[in-house]
Design a protein with these regions (language model features):
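Cleavable N-terminal signal peptides
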Residues: 12-14, 24
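Sec/Tat signal peptide C-region and signal peptidase I cleavage site
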Residues: 20-26
């Protein structure tokens, strides 16, 4: 059986940082983060882990530039273009325009972008996208089965597709529970039909994460899914103070039980997307002379997205609910349970 890109274990001027593994190499992988920083315990960090894994596996050089604001995107990308990068990886939907402009101006430079797909595709850009609604559907069903108040909540960082896809899947998972059980669990914070909901309009203010979770808790939610990168750490702090009997958090992107160890006990689970694995695969393809524009898509079936283990809360999740989640996972994979419209 061949190498599976998703069977590996791991957001967004300017300070240039370099990391080397082993001896200096002729191959250099470069990355531009979105706001939030390289060590955000979530989006940027997970993508950077893919570079770190490639350093360990292949002995390449890795560099990154951190974007402190959206105004840094163009300058950061252009700086790396001048830095002899064999592949430039940009992290996040918001870097889509800047990446496209740079790619068109530098057609011989390979690029890859996390969470963006170009239509029509660009010949020198490989997009990395994820069917996170599939895993979030499982999280919504789980939350509906675990809530005591019959109210769950979610909020996003910015109203963009890579954020709302989590919220869509979560809401549909709750709807599926209600339909199967004749129940009436309510989702606060997102209306999939109206495309309206709660958004902090940033990915880095932990105080907003606390405040938004507090508002949802005050309205009765006892499980909250923050889809806002490091902002969600503020929600976890609130859950830590209130106690998990009153508020549980569902993480996103990485398994926050491992990346947010100080508050790991508040996470019921996490909706993970394996950016580390796709970044690693892009680097390997490029090293092997196999780079071409197009898309890599992470799904439940190939392990590109998933629902993390319940860890410390495993004993709280009924065996019947676990069995139902396994059956739903199989149904999503074989197409008998529809998630996307």
């Amino acid at each position: 059986m061949g190498y599976s890109p998703f069977n590996r274990t791991v957001f967004g001027a300017v300070a240039l940082c370099c990391a080397l593994a082993g001896q200096a190499s002729a191959f250099t992988a470069c990355q531009v983060t979105d706001t939030g920083g390289i060590d955000d315990n979530s989006f940027n960090q997970t993508a950077w882990k893919g570079v770190e894994d490639a350093q360990k596996d292949f002995g390449i050089e890795g560099r990154f530039l951190e974007s402190q604001a959206e105004t840094d995107y163009d300058a950061n990308i252009n700086s790396l273009i001048e830095g002899d990068c064999d592949i430039i990886i940009t992290v996040g939907f918001l870097l889509g325009d800047a990446t496209e402009k740079a790619a068109k101006a530098n057609p011989d430079q390979p690029f890859s972008i996390v969470d963006f797909a170009y239509d029509p595709p660009l010949s020198n850009v490989l997009g990395q996208v994820y069917a996170t609604d599939q895993a979030a559907f499982l999280a919504g069903y789980l939350a509906a089965g675990m809530t005591q108040s019959k109210i769950v909540g979610t909020f996003g960082g910015i109203n963009i597709p890579p954020v709302t896809i989590f919220m869509d899947g979560f809401a549909k998972g709750v709807d599926h529970w209600n339909a199967e059980k004749g129940d009436s669990v309510v989702v606060l914070g997102w209306d999939p039909a109206a495309r309206e909901g709660l958004f902090t309009n940033n990915f880095d203010n932990l105080d907003d994460g606390r405040a938004f979770a507090q508002n949802l808790y005050d309205e009765g939610a006892d499980i909250v899914l923050p889809v806002a990168g490091p902002v969600g750490l503020g929600s976890a702090t609130l859950a830590d103070e209130l106690g998990i009997d009153k508020l549980k958090i569902i993480g996103v992107d990485a398994d926050l039980y491992f990346t947010d160890t100080e508050r790991q006990h508040v996470y019921l689970t996490s909706v993970t997307k394996r950016m580390d694995a796709t970044v690693h695969q892009v680097i390997e393809r490029t090293m092997n002379g196999e780079f071409e524009g197009g898309l890599l898509v992470g799904t439940l079936e190939n392990g590109g997205v998933d629902l993390a283990p319940f860890h410390d809360m495993d004993a709280l999740v009924p065996d019947e609910l676990k069995a139902e989640l396994s059956a739903i996972r199989a149904g999503i994979i074989d197409g008998s349970i529809a998630v996307s419209n």
